[in-house]
Swiss-Prot record:
Binding sites annotated in the UniProt record for Mg(2+): E218
Recorded name of the encoding gene: CCR4
Lineage: Eukaryota, Fungi, Fungi incertae sedis, Microsporidia, Enterocytozoonidae
One Pfam family cited in the UniProt record for this chain: LRR_14
GO molecular function: metal ion binding; poly(A)-specific ribonuclease activity; RNA binding
Name used for this protein in its record: Probable CCR4-Not complex 3'-5'-exoribonuclease subunit Ccr4
Length: 481
């Protein structure tokens, strides 16, 4: 009778919990089973369940993604569910004084853990000898290969019938994650972020899709010069150009060049006729419109993003194509700078479109912008409202901006949920935009959402970057009159 009363009170207490409850202490309550009600309290940051009679941690514990402190010490737990590794915000985890024998490798993904205790458990070798410090977590992280095999990413037709009389050209964009940034990813195994390992997987990806024009971002300059340029020339008949991006050293505050954006093309299909390199910082501070606008000069300081525009003529049909490769600034606190960079870039493309009257346009890259952003809306809708730069003085731009290009998103209407996936971010921020006289006939399929439920972020054993490759195939008619 006493047990039933406790269970009744326990369920009643949970049912009456505030949806925004952040902490729950249920220690010393004689609890044997964790009810589903607890796993629905998604706002919890602390869950204390020590000194009970709990035997099983439910898989649904992974719902509590905001948890920072989790205490299961002094219970009767025999097994740690792999789903526990999805609680990536955990800073404290206490599993000591249970009956745990093994530790799942997925626990290594808990990269924010500061305090971890699993002492006084009958752990088998080698877990037991590593239980006193974080070496157990490192061991799990380094040996975690338990990733579900993703579905093959194949070409998906976007039209019912393809005109066989027209030439087809494939385009793609891929932020491949430079080694400088990869080395800071504490949630990934060292062998996953190792440059040599990632180079091999990246090469396999390039070869598998064999794109006619490939735009890359965050390409290590040294690796481009010593590896990619030569290897891709040999294996895919590519030629390529790189535009280095300056990065400021945090110690010396001096600019250095670690990585850049690259455009590769098939030498047997395209002839390069012009190249335009844009340093957004230099372009903006030297623009007469912004000469006396201190807000712009302050906001743009040390924002060293670049854009690379290459103009090609097709070898068989003499069609002109403007390929614009870009990597916009990342910080969401500087959305005004992203918009300004976009305005400047589209102005340059407009100028080239006037020069090459019948040219087609493919604009692709890492825009660091969501589909509901002003950057995306400006590209698609061709205009900006008058208040987007408030409270800063952007001169005439505060009155609204327009452009004349008609561009579409190649993945519009298709079920793509992300192009960038990390433990703290999962969204579409990379795009392929194309002009209206290009016929989109197929795209590379997205990664299925089911796969992302088994991992906390990229890169991993299957994907070498925190971004994914996206690609599209187009047909277009000759630009000759």
């Amino acid at each position: 009778m006493e047990e039933k009363i406790k269970k009744k009170d326990y369920n009643k207490d949970i049912d009456n919990c505030d949806d925004e409850l952040e902490g729950l202490d249920m220690s010393f309550q004689g609890i044997k089973v964790i009810g589903k009600e607890i796993t629905l309290l998604v706002s919890l940051k602390q869950l204390i369940l020590n000194n009970n009679d709990i035997e099983t941690i439910p898989e649904d514990i992974s719902n509590l993604i905001r948890l920072e402190v989790l205490d299961f010490s002094y219970n009767k737990i025999e097994k740690i569910p792999t789903e526990l590794g999805r609680l990536i915000n955990l800073k404290e985890l206490y599993l000591n004084n249970n009956m745990i024998v093994e530790v799942p490798m997925e626990l290594g993904t808990l990269y924010k853990l500061e305090n971890f205790s699993i002492l006084n458990n009958p752990l088998v070798h080698p877990y037991g000898i590593m239980s006193k410090d974080k070496s157990l977590l490192r061991f799990c992280r380094e040996n975690n290969t338990n990733y579900k095999q993703p579905n093959d990413r194949v070409w998906i037709d976007t039209v019912l019938k393809i005109d066989q009389s027209l030439e087809t050209y494939s385009f793609g964009t891929f932020n491949i994650l430079c080694s400088l940034y990869a080395s800071n990813l504490t949630y990934a195994p060292s062998w996953v972020i190792n440059l040599e390992c990632r180079k091999d997987i990246l090469m396999q990806t390039f070869i598998a899709y064999n794109l006619d024009i490939l735009c890359l971002q965050e390409v290590d300059i040294n690796v481009f010069n010593t590896f990619y340029k030569e290897q891709l020339a040999q294996k895919l008949d590519y030629d390529g150009v790189i535009l280095p991006k300056k990065s400021f050293d945090k110690v010396t505050d001096q600019p250095k060049k670690f990585h850049g954006i690259v455009t590769f093309w098939k030498k047997n299909k395209f002839k390069l006729i012009e190249q335009v390199s844009i340093d957004f910082f230099q372009k903006i501070i030297n623009d007469k419109r912004f000469k006396y606008l201190s807000d712009i000069h302050t906001r743009i300081f040390q924002k060293t993003n670049v854009g690379l525009i290459t103009i090609f003529e097709t070898c068989n049909t003499n069609i002109i194509i403007i390929v614009a490769n870009v990597h916009l600034y990342w910080n969401p606190e500087f959305n005004d700078i992203k918009i300004l960079q976009t305005i400047i870039y589209l102005e340059e493309i407009e100028f080239l479109k006037e020069k090459y009257k019948h040219a087609h346009i493919v604009l692709q890259g890492d825009f660091n912008s969501l589909q509901n952003s002003h950057v995306y809306q400006y590209i698609i809708n061709r205009k900006l409202p008058t208040n987007i730069f408030d409270p800063w003085d952007y001169g005439s731009l505060n009155n609204g901006v327009t452009h004349s290009l008609t561009l579409r998103n190649a993945y519009d209407g298709h079920d793509i949920t992300f192009t960038n996936f990390t433990p703290s971010f999962k969204a579409v921020i990379d795009y392929i935009f194309y002009s209206k006289y290009l016929n989109l006939i197929s795209i590379i399929s997205p990664i299925e959402d089911e796969y992302t439920k088994t991992t906390i972020g990229l890169p991993n054993i299957h994907f070498p970057s925190d971004h994914i490759l996206i690609g599209a195939k187009f047909q277009f008619k000759s630009s000759k009159k």
